[in-house]
């Protein structure tokens, strides 16, 4: 039997086969990104099986579904979007250069066929309703008929999206352009070699499918080869002659995860009418029972039991029956390579629980199977090798898989995967104005490539951020800092230096609970904890009270010396309180209201002035006298201070010494004595005591802590804590819509700060509202694991960048917060060390992104450019050599290019 290929038309986002009339068919496709289960637990595989059974159940008698799966190297759309983002947002030479290097490298790999990507599409095909053209219903207009089918496809799409969207999949209804491009790719395997910029230029909706996409005949191959030659490629066809005897979830991976490209799987599925099937089986059972009564053969008894069980299974709805046709096509420019592919595919089929593949010897049969696999065409008249199968078994052999690509469609950074794929990640997620920062933690041992990975991610994402703060030790980021801002030098934090960061300076913001917590925590670190826990609590209470009294004193001083300004501030405080209550949510703080009203004033000056003026003098006076209002007014005063006007560490120490009285007088004097070494005349100079002289005006601030000796661990912890709070105020003053980020070189140091847990948690949660992304680095996981900041850091982080680990117990501990499948745990333990790799070196890590549905887990390989390695390497010998080589360059990027 020789068939002719089907023809039809694209229009109104559907495909019409054989005319929109009785005997015709109408289809629509859906582009599907299957849930990425490569590193998932068995529970997720079982859940996918259940979802696929539900998908099959949506088919009504007479309707058919087709699963189209193929593998190629097409990352064109995502790479072009990445390039467009570079052109649009990257103003920095270094970021431009590194992003362009990745784009060019990946584009070349794509054109050379070195990349691999699986694609999955679903097609639903419905017969055109014959009654629509009959006398009983009257003749429907073409548009009305199409509208009816479009609505049915729309509902199917909503169902499929709801089904797989909850487990991390994505479903996109295909348009006319999508249908055309799928057919063009399907019928023209040489299309990628033609380097056509926009295939849609060739789309003519007035022409049929064959006129648009079918540009050559198939001709038979000479024996002993089977199949046909078409579009410069040799094609071979296989079909499943017998299906697996038993199935399990992910069984189809044996076919979809082969290590080569250019083959496709097509599964045509037809639901069986259960009532008719039961009736037919009942008749068969009656006949077999009669034969058994006559012959008494054991074989007939077994057949009776099988048929009875089948009838019972279908009658109680335990299973649903389907018919399916499973077609495999492979193509290659070489006959020998095609034979090798077909051999590998046959072996893969055999491994699927004793399934068997059939290779048609006749070119006519091969063509018929080819025509039966055309996209959307599941009603071919070629009835060979259709099989009856139950729903769960059908679900397990469907090629429902796709390549793990992470967040590639909206990637801010891109890396290689482990199977020829590209993987993307992002620091913000959401849609439109609802983008939120996805705080991250990177964990890795020494030599795992942690520094190179961190700087590479910072480089690729730099175009999207307005400000970067780095607190590090070891000068790992010193060269990168200069690539962002040529004038930026590391801010050296050391004892007895000239750097001063006043921890009592609110940096132009009102006094807030968050600032008070930090301002009390730092002196508490300075005085240390007592072995007596009650005495420690007393110290903290006394210090908090003293800090509050100090702010009270300075606020009164301001009110007495700036009476006119104080009156205006009272009106502003009253207006801010009303603004928060009337226009902001119940969770908004006074600080939130201050920042939002400031932006509101800049954008709507007249309206803001009117809002301030609406309160009369008596209302303002009453607000200022009220206890809560007076507190808000006191806090607002500090937003008007100049750096030299703020209280300083020395003032706190003097207050404790001068006002020591009552039952705790001795303790207060003792605290004053303990705080004295931290004053300007003490052991650490002006670092904590004096007028702030660090001005954060550029795009990046790099604080270097390596000049503080390891023996001064408390000083290093205090400095890191001070930096975090100092830059936090700067970020909160910037426009909220701009992205900012904090990079903490060793976040475990915050554990040494009393109340460090509280401040880290509040900082993470509070700064999320101000578009601040945090990246915390952990090298000493043992110290981090036992600290009290582990909870707030991991609890507020959505991304885990997991480098090579050497201690399995650390990975198990991480699983308490980030449920890590056993397969991923094994992979993390075996990530290679970059320095021990032979040939091309790379830093491999696991990208774990939590989601409200389920975690996204992919493996990334950072094949860094020579320039990136030169910039980011932190080894001692390389550091000294690089410093000498770059010394003479005003433009550090030019120096990197010249010496890399």
Predicted features by range, described:
Residues 1-387:
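Extended, folded cores of ATP/NTP-driven motor/assembly subunits in large transport
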Residues 421-433:
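Pre-Walker A adenine-sensing motif
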Residues 442:
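Hydrophobic anchor at the beta1->P-loop junction of P-loop NTPases
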């Amino acid at each position: 039997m020789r068939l002719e290929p089907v023809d039809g038309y694209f229009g109104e986002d559907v495909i019409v086969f054989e005319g929109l009339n009785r005997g015709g068919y109408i289809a629509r496709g859906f582009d599907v990104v299957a849930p990425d289960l490569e590193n998932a637990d068995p529970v997720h595989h079982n859940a996918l099986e259940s979802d696929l059974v539900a998908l099959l159940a949506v088919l009504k008698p007479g309707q058919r579904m087709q699963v189209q799966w193929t593998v190629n190297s097409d990352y064109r759309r995502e790479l072009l979007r990445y390039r467009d983002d570079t052109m649009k947002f990257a103003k920095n030479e270094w970021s431009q250069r590194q992003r362009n290097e990745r784009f060019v490298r990946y584009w070349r790999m794509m054109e050379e066929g070195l990349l691999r990507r699986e694609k999955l599409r679903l097609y639903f095909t419905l017969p055109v309703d014959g009654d629509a053209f009959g006398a009983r219903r009257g003749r429907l207009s073409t548009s009305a008929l199409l509208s009816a089918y479009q609505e049915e496809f729309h509902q199917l799409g909503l169902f499929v999206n709801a089904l797989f969207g909850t487990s991390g999949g994505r479903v996109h209804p295909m348009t006319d352009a999508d249908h055309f491009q799928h057919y063009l790719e399907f019928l023209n395997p040489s299309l990628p070699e033609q380097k056509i910029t926009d295939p849609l230029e060739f789309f003519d909706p007035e022409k049929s499918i064959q006129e648009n996409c079918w540009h050559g005949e198939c001709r038979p191959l000479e024996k002993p080869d089977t199949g046909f030659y078409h579009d410069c490629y040799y094609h071979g066809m296989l079909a499943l002659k017998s299906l697996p005897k038993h199935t399990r979830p992910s069984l189809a991976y044996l076919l979809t995860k082969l290590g080569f490209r250019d083959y496709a799987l097509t599964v045509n599925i037809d639901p069986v009418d259960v009532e008719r099937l039961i009736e037919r089986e009942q008749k068969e059972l009656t006949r077999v029972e009669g034969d058994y009564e006559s012959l008494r053969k054991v074989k007939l008894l077994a057949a009776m039991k099988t048929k009875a069980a089948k009838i019972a299974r279908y009658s109680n709805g335990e299973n649903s029956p389907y018919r399916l046709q499973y077609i495999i096509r492979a193509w290659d420019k070489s006959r020998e390579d095609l034979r090798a592919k077909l051999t590998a595919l046959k072996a893969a089929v055999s491994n699927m629980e004793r399934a068997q593949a059939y290779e048609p010897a006749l070119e006519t049969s091969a063509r018929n199977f080819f025509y039966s696999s055309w996209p959307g065409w599941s009603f071919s008249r070629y009835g060979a090798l259709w099989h009856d199968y139950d729903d769960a078994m059908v679900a397990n052999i469907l090629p429902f898989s796709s390549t793990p690509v992470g967040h590639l469609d909206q990637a801010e950074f891109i890396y290689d995967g482990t199977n020829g794929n590209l993987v993307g990640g992002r620091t913000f997620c959401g849609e439109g104005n609802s983008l939120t920062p996805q705080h991250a933690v990177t964990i890795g041992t020494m030599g795992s490539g942690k520094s190179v990975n961190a700087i590479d991610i910072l480089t690729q994402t730099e175009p999207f951020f307005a400000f970067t703060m780095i607190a590090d030790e070891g000068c790992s980021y010193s060269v990168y800092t200069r690539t962002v801002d040529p004038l930026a030098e590391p801010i050296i934090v050391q004892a007895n230096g000239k750097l001063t960061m006043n921890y009592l300076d609110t940096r132009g913001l009102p006094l807030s609970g968050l600032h008070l917590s930090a301002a009390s925590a730092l002196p508490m670190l300075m005085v240390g904890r007592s072995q007596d826990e009650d005495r420690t609590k007393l110290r903290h209470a006394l210090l908090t009270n003293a800090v509050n009294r100090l702010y009270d004193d300075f606020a009164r001083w301001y009110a007495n010396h700036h009476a006119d300004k104080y009156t205006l501030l009272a009106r502003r405080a009253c207006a801010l309180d009303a603004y928060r209550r009337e226009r902001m949510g119940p969770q908004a703080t006074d600080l939130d209201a201050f920042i939002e009203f400031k932006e509101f004033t800049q954008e709507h000056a007249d309206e803001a002035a009117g809002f301030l003026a609406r309160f009369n003098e008596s209302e303002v006076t009453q607000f200022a006298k009220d206890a809560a209002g007076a507190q808000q007014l006191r806090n607002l005063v500090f937003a008007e201070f100049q750096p030299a006007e703020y209280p300083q560490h020395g003032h706190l120490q003097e207050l404790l010494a001068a006002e020591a009285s009552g039952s705790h007088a001795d303790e207060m004097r003792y605290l004053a004595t303990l705080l004295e070494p931290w004053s300007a005349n003490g052991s650490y100079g002006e670092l904590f005591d004096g007028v702030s002289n660090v001005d954060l005006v550029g795009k990046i601030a790099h604080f270097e802590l390596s000049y503080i000796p390891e023996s001064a661990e408390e000083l290093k912890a205090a400095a890191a804590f001070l930096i975090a709070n100092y830059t936090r105020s700067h970020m909160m003053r910037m426009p909220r819509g701009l992205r900012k980020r904090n990079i903490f070189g060793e976040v475990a140091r915050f554990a040494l700060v009393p109340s460090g847990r509280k401040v880290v948690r509040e900082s993470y949660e509070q700064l999320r509202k101000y578009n601040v992304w945090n990246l915390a680095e952990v090298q000493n996981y043992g110290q981090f694991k036992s600290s009290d900041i582990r909870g707030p850091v991991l609890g507020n982080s959505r991304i885990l960048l997991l480098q090579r680990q050497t201690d399995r117990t650390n990975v198990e501990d991480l699983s308490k917060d980030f449920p890590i499948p056993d397969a991923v745990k094994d992979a993390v333990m075996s990530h290679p060390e970059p320095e021990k790799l032979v040939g091309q070196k790379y830093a491999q890590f696991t990208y774990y992104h939590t989601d409200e549905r389920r975690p996204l887990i992919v493996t990334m390989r950072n094949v860094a450019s020579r320039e990136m390695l030169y910039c980011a390497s932190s080894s001692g010998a390389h550091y000294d050599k690089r410093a000498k080589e770059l010394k003479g360059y005003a433009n550090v990027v030019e120096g990197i290019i010249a010496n890399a």
